Curated annotation (Swiss-Prot):
The gene is SEC24. One of its GO terms (cellular component) is endoplasmic reticulum membrane. GO terms for molecular function: SNARE binding; zinc ion binding. This is Protein transport protein SEC24. The COPII coat is composed of at least 5 proteins: the SEC23/24 complex, the SEC13/31 complex, and the protein SAR1. Golgi apparatus membrane; Peripheral membrane protein; Cytoplasmic side. Belongs to the SEC23/SEC24 family. SEC24 subfamily. It is found in: Cytoplasm; Cytoplasmic vesicle, COPII-coated vesicle membrane; Endoplasmic reticulum membrane; Golgi apparatus membrane. Its main location: cytoplasm. Component of the coat protein complex II (COPII) which promotes the formation of transport vesicles from the endoplasmic reticulum (ER). The coat has two main functions, the physical deformation of the endoplasmic reticulum membrane into vesicles and the selection of cargo molecules. Residues 244-269 are annotated as: Zinc finger-like. CDD domains: Sec24-like. GO terms for biological process: COPII-coated vesicle cargo loading; intracellular protein transport. InterPro entries: ADF-H/Gelsolin-like_dom_sf, Gelsolin-like_dom, Gelsolin-like_dom_sf, Sec23/24_helical_dom, Sec23/24_helical_dom_sf, Sec23/24_trunk_dom, Sec23_24_beta_S, SEC23_SEC24_subfamily. It comes from Kluyveromyces lactis (strain ATCC 8585 / CBS 2359 / DSM 70799 / NBRC 1267 / NRRL Y-1140 / WM37).
């Protein structure tokens, strides 16, 4: 603990309404209704079910604490009356500045709105009660003998501001009784990090699904860490892989053991299968991972491989054109790759590397093995139409055997091309050459470029953005592929098990919409660094950290992913970065560890059983030269009641589904149509809920009702209309295309944060925030606040986390003490704005705490993103009009304001207006 004195910064403290009503979170079973009207459970397995339900009930009770603010009544006085704060650590209290436009008598309209909660446009506060229409009571219509999630309706207007802590709650539980498991335990049917279903109670027929207006889909994330050593899943290593003879489903915790353990009945197709004798060779079969876990890895026997496991192979294509030399990208990439050689996956010591440099010609390097000397030769190939390999050997070399010479080459690359003034970049020819080089093994082609592909096959051209910006033709003109090569080449890559990853860093147009297809259909990814300059340490840090983590993530090759559903279910749609090889098979040349996928499910016949099952199987070759199968299996109850469908809906997974559908339709339908797609989807659900779930027909003056487990979903859908990918207004084409690309691949937690940014109030954060927890040692983060300007004080300090970037907003009327403690200068006009880092100030603990919060937010081992910090200065009446940074500051303020998604962005509604519009629509 630092010896520095703590400070207190100005903040408003007011009385709020008493008698706060705690909303109830949906997706659980209240204790008072468990087993109501049901027979007593007597068997041990059924007793275990009681315990499971009790735990779920207790969890729901605990969740309630997160849905309302915890308020100390003694900390508030009369509403609207500022009070003196207690001393903070003995330090002198910072007074509020009383200059014009900021004093108590001259406060801004936004601040007045925040200081008077009883007059908020969001309607009644939590303490106020309102007569509500009748609705289905919890427990009504429950299936006898089968516990289900229950419905807890809420008024969305009463839930304003929306309780954002709901975004971190788990989904409604999968209510599967223990007798449906071979070995009941907590690791069976508990894999929401890997697999989430939009509906945790599946409608028994397609008509009920259509009636609900909710989608049935899965959000899949096969790997949750970048490396296998982090959180490994249970593994069956004896080579015994048991599958159903008919449907080919894998043995899982939900099969039925029959005939005294000699056979098992498949839970997908109901076929009886024999157990192989080998299943008992290593002891008790019921201790095997596949009986005890929903997520399990199998080391596959040789029958699962069509050829010996190939070595991990990387072909790096480096842009050496004038733009790449000028902005320092080549030097940065070469240095980063050099520093990452130790972390490139090489578990079996067979990893191979090739380096090709490109401008208007192709520059190959023949790298000798270290034992053969250090004479590295460069071959220049100018034939772009039919590029050829200039040497039969030495172009693709083992990392471990040519390490010294690879280091020598990477060190010398910037010097070799430092005088290059060629403006052209033959991307397509380089890609074809790299594919020709590694086609025998498969692997990855990683492109680092700073220039639009402008010569040879696959030439792209700048598009006239100004002519179509913010018009109905914008999407079709700017987002469609500019050349057919970028759709045909990925097909060739899939034939040879090759993935393409793109790292584009430029301050000019590079046509992300076209080149992103290279990764989209090969299981790869496109990363974009607009305005990159090696002279800016912030740019270098972001690129280096992300590029290094990308090449260091474990590499899995020759992968195929298949989804199975039990009788009556079929896969109808697939979304994500892969090649859809057949109706239910997705091919990934390599498996990315930081992406997720969405599979849509259809109901093609009446579901007659009480439970259905879904299984994801991913067959791949690991970097350790093992053929492995990752199997993920869950069981889901079925229902013929619409109330139970709604009570079990997962609002985050549903949002991911609609985001994928919107990404798919935007290029052809346009952005206005896509925004209306979000609005209409919410309207249909609210209308269905009002008509089919509420037991009385209510008039236009009634509340806007929805179940509590879906109460954040309208906010997320509304926020999507303001996302850079879909919003109206002028958005650069490359930025919009990259935003669509991110929505298509982000893992669910990062997707939600990218849709609804997390906002932290730092100037008034609790004493423990920003310091290590006494028990865990982890840095404590302050509680987030709603993403709205109505909560931002003009003298405050706020951090906005979008999942990809961070914005540190300092109010224009912040007192000099706060500015000094954070930035080391009392003059707010001297704060460095834009991409930057906070200075290290030894004289103030508050600076350390803020830096700790930023560092903690940047910590993650499941994606490669490094969040750039943008420092933004708020407006102030004393700000000079002709300040040199005025234009940059105005742009930063607009960008920051666009992250406050509960407010108006461009011509969109704020959230309350959106709900009012929905209410009007469904009342017609």
């Amino acid at each position: 603990m630092s010896h520095h004195k703590k400070r207190v910064y100005p903040q408003a403290q007011y009385q709020i309404a008493e008698g706060i009503a705690q909303p109830i979170v949906g997706g659980g079973v209240p204790p008072q209704t468990v087993g109501a009207g049901q027979p007593q459970f007597l068997t041990p397995a059924q007793q275990h079910l009681h315990q499971q339900i009790d735990q779920a009930s207790n969890g729901i009770g605990n969740m309630q604490l997160h849905n309302v603010p915890v308020v100390d009544p003694t900390a508030f006085q009369q509403a609207g009356t500022p009070v003196q704060q207690p001393p903070y650590g003995g330090a002198p209290q910072y007074g509020q500045p009383m200059n014009s436009g900021y004093g108590a008598d001259n406060i801004s309209g936004v601040q007045q709105q925040y200081q008077q909660p009883m007059q908020q446009p969001y309607g009644q506060t939590y303490g106020q009660q309102q007569q509500q229409p009748q609705y289905q009571q919890p427990g009504v219509g429950m299936a006898v003998g089968k516990p289900m999630n229950q419905l807890y309706p809420v008024d969305l207007f009463q839930e304003l501001p929306p309780p954002i802590t709901d975004l971190s709650l788990p989904p409604p539980p999968l209510m599967l009784p223990p007798e449906k498991m071979i070995v009941p335990n907590d690791t069976v049917n508990n894999c929401s990090d890997h697999l989430r279903c939009t509906l945790n109670a599946v409608p028994k027929n397609n008509s009920l699904l259509k009636k609900s207006k909710l989608p049935l889909a899965m959000v899949i994330r096969p790997y949750t860490k970048l490396t296998d050593s982090e959180c490994p899943v249970p593994t069956s290593e004896d080579g015994v892989v048991v599958r159903c003879r008919r449907c080919r489903a894998y043995l899982n915790p939900f099969v039925q053991v029959i005939e005294n353990g000699l056979r098992w009945r498949c839970n997908f197709c109901n076929l009886a299968n024999n157990f192989p004798q080998a299943i008992d060779m290593n002891g008790n079969r019921y201790e095997r991972p596949e009986f005890n876990h929903s997520v399990v890895d199998f080391v596959a026997p040789k029958e699962y491989a069509v050829r010996p496991p190939p070595p991990s192979t990387y072909a790096f294509i480096l842009d050496v054109s004038q733009a790449s030399i000028k902005n320092g990208l080549l030097a940065t990439a070469a240095r980063t790759l050099l520093e990452s050689l130790d972390t490139i996956p090489n578990h079996d010591e067979r990893t191979r590397i090739s380096i090709i440099c490109v401008d208007q010609s192709l520059h190959y390097f023949r790298i000798p093995l270290d034992e053969e000397g250090d004479n590295i030769k460069m071959y220049d190939v100018a034939d772009l139409d039919e590029p050829f390999l200039p040497s039969p050997t030495g172009l693709l070399v083992p990392l471990i055997e040519a390490r010294s010479n690879i280091e020598k080459l990477l060190t010398s690359l910037p010097e070799i091309f430092q005088q290059n003034i060629q403006p052209r970049f033959a991307l397509a020819s380089a890609l074809k050459s790299a594919l020709n080089l590694i086609r025998a093994q498969g692997g990855k082609i990683i492109v680092v470029g700073a220039t639009l592909a402008n010569v040879g096959e696959g030439t792209l051209h700048k598009r006239n953005e100004k002519a179509v910006a913010n018009t109905s033709k914008e999407a079709s003109t700017l987002l469609n592929t500019g050349d057919a090569f970028y759709k045909s080449f990925p097909i060739e890559c899939n034939k040879y098990q090759v993935t393409v990853d793109m790292f584009m860093a430029s301050d000019d147009y590079v046509d992300i919409a076209s080149i992103s297809n290279l990764g989209r259909f090969t299981g790869g990814q496109t990363h974009f660094y607009p305005g990159f300059s090696a002279l800016n340490l912030i740019d270098v840090t972001k690129f280096s950290k992300e590029f290094s983590k990308h090449v260091s993530m474990d590499l899995s090759l020759e992968a195929v992913m298949r989804a199975r559903g039990s009788s009556g279910l079929k896969m109808t749609g697939f979304y994500g970065h892969f090649f859809n090889r057949s109706s239910d098979l997705c091919a990934l040349a390599t498996v990315p560890r930081d992406q997720s996928y969405v599979f849509e499910i259809g109901i093609d016949e009446q579901l007659t059983k009480d439970f259905v099952y879904i299984q994801i199987a991913l067959l791949l070759t690991s970097n350790a030269a093992q053929r492995r199968i990752r199997v993920i299996t869950i069981g889901i109850p079925t229902t013929d009641k619409l109330t139970e469908v709604y009570a079990s809906a997962d609002q985050l997974a549903i949002t991911a589904y609609f985001a994928q559908k919107a990404v798919e339709r935007a290029p052809s339908s346009g952005f206005e149509d896509t925004r209306e797609f979000f609005n209409k989807s919410v309207q249909e659900v609210l209308a269905t809920y009002k008509k089919e779930v509420l037991t009385s027909n209510t008039g236009g003056g009634a509340p806007l009702m929805l179940c509590s487990n879906l109460r954040m979903w309208p906010l997320l859908m509304h926020s999507l209309t303001k996302h850079m990918a879909f919003r109206s207004g002028i958005v650069p084409a490359d930025h919009r295309a990259q935003a669509l690309n991110n929505l298509e691949t982000l893992p669910l937690p990062y997707l939600i944060q990218n849709i609804y940014p997390t906002v932290y109030s730092l100037h008034d954060m609790p004493d423990e925030a920003g310091l290590p927890d006494e028990e865990t040692g982890e840095i404590v983060l302050p509680q987030p606040i709603n993403s709205t300007s109505s909560l931002l004080e003009r003298y405050g300090l706020y951090l906005i986390d979008t999942g990809l970037d961070m914005f540190l907003w300092i109010g224009g009327d912040a007192v000099p003490e706060l500015v000094t403690d954070v930035f080391g200068t009392p003059d707010i006009m001297e704060i460095p704005i834009g991409k930057n880092e906070l200075p290290l100030l030894d004289a103030t603990e508050f600076n350390l705490r803020v830096r700790n919060v930023i560092t903690k937010i940047r910590e993650h081992d499941d994606v490669i993103f490094y969040k750039t910090l943008h420092i933004v200065r708020g407006a102030s009446p004393s700000e000079p009009m002709n300040h040199p940074s005025a234009r940059e500051v105005a742009s930063l303020r607009l960008w920051t304001a666009s992250q406050l998604v509960e407010d108006k962005v461009q011509n969109s509604w704020n959230y309350r207006e959106f709900l009012q519009n929905m209410k009007t629509r469904i009342s017609k």
